[in-house]
Amino acid sequence: MVLVKICGLMHSEDILAVNTAGADFAGFVFAPGRHQISLEQALSLKQLLHPKIKTVGVFVNEPVAEILAIYQAGAIDVAQLHGKSTPTEITQFQQAGLKVIQVFERQAIDLTSMADYLMVDSGKGSGQLLNLKAIPHISRPLILAGGLTPLNVRQAVQLVQPTMVDVSSGVETNGHKDADKITQFIQQAKEDIIYEDIK
């Protein structure tokens, strides 16, 4: 069954929503932008999070030492790396016990990446849906992000068969996380898919 990450969590009510809906991963954004939170906020939110939900820190070209400091403070279990990341940097994180998601825009996936997960995204916060049919089927753990909503995630899972789907603005109303949309998204993503075109 596909895993679900709800990203851009900022408030205690966001945490309550992902706890109730049964998300697998919760995303805290440390990179500049409207969802950015501080280490102190992340630690406070993590205390409210169900213990089975793993936390992912989102970074854009952040120095290795700063990411490791956030990990060692106990705020994150996984680092999601946008921008340029070298194999040496990824290995440094992994040797410290931190799992790594490396993000690739559109279909430009580097299968030689040392990361634990490869994410294909339509571009930082663009909200655009990728051309799902152009995404290659790979044997590596793949995360699908960008433009997903409760209305299209089921079809996206069916077409791409990712390990995980990732959503932020697609479960928001007026710029704030919407508990009903989070529940709908997770239900749609995890619903058993019947391949109706197979006779």
UniProtKB/Swiss-Prot annotation:
As for family, the record states: Belongs to the TrpF family.
Give the PANTHER family listed for this entry.
N-(5'-PHOSPHORIBOSYL)ANTHRANILATE ISOMERASE (PTHR42894:SF1)
Its Enzyme Commission number(s) read: 5.3.1.24
* Entry keyword set: Amino-acid biosynthesis, Aromatic amino acid biosynthesis, Isomerase, Tryptophan biosynthesis
Q: Which organism is it from?
A: Lacticaseibacillus paracasei (strain ATCC 334 / BCRC 17002 / CCUG 31169 / CIP 107868 / KCTC 3260 / NRRL B-441)
Q: Which Gene Ontology terms describe the biological processes this protein takes part in?
A: L-tryptophan biosynthetic process
Q: Which GO terms describe its molecular function?
A: phosphoribosylanthranilate isomerase activity
**Which pathway or pathways does this protein act in?**
Amino-acid biosynthesis; L-tryptophan biosynthesis; L-tryptophan from chorismate: step 3/5
Pfam families noted in UniProt? PRAI
The organism that produces this protein has a lineage beginning with: Bacteria, Bacillati, Bacillota, Bacilli, Lactobacillales
Q: Which InterPro entries match?
A: Aldolase_TIM, PRAI_dom, RibuloseP-bd_barrel, TrpF_fam
Top-level taxon of origin: Bacteria
The protein's name in its UniProt record:
N-(5'-phosphoribosyl)anthranilate isomerase
Query: Which reaction is this enzyme known to catalyze?
Result: N-(5-phospho-beta-D-ribosyl)anthranilate = 1-(2-carboxyphenylamino)-1-deoxy-D-ribulose 5-phosphate
